[in-house]
């Protein structure tokens, strides 16, 4: 059974200031000889409401650029959407915390994004003395990425990630943090 995740912008169909009914229907239009085709909705359906300038759904990707015992360079890549017709001067910020909730890195950068554009921005952060992730020690960090305008946060996305170094070559095979 395949699970398909998708997003549909219904902005043009919503009547602001009025009650709106949203109906979600799945039609499995392909005939099947099986008594049960498996079609339908098996997970929650969510209504996402966003500002015209926002982080794309599932639009944050956190990547370990480099790592050793003393420092890890982390790239927080954020896909920003500007559905407004005018150019916006906004900021992108990111904060990384350890499992205890202590801030281990944070930063921000100004962004100028044209109207009706989606673009990805990379913010580099550095974590001192990182706790590495592996199968025996699944150390996790939390990220919070936000976009905002002036003093107002417009959108935020959060999640978890592990800091690790992955290597793959024909001689040593797959290594995580230098170990097989």
Question: Residue spans of the language-model regions?
Answer:
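Short proline/glycine- and polar residue-rich coil/turn motifs
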Residues: 1-2, 14-15, 110-119
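Short acidic/polar inter-strand loop motif in beta-rich domains
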Residues: 27-34, 132, 148-156
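Short glycine/proline/serine/threonine-rich loop/turn segments at secondary-structure transition edges
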Residues: 14-19, 87, 117-118, 127-142
């Amino acid at each position: 059974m395949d699970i398909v995740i998708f997003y549909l912008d219904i902005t043009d169909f919503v009547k602001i200031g009025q009650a709106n009914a949203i109906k979600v229907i799945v039609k499995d239009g392909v005939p099947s000889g099986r008594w049960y085709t498996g079609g339908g909705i098996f997970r929650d359906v969510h209504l996402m409401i966003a500002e015209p300038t926002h982080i794309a759904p599932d639009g944050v990707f956190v990547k370990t650029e480099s790592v050793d015992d003393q420092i890890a360079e982390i790239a927080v890549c954020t896909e920003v959407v500007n559905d407004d017709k005018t150019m916006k001067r906004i900021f992108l910020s990111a904060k990384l915390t350890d499992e205890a909730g202590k801030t281990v890195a944070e930063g921000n950068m100004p962004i100028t994004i044209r109207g009706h554009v989606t673009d990805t921005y990379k913010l580099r952060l550095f974590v001192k003395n990182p706790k590495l992730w592996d199968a025996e020690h699944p150390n996790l960090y939390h990220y919070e990425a936000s976009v905002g305008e002036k003093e107002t946060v417009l959108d935020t996305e959060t999640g978890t990630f592990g800091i690790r170094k992955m290597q793959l070559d024909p001689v040593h095979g797959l290594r995580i943090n230098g170990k097989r």
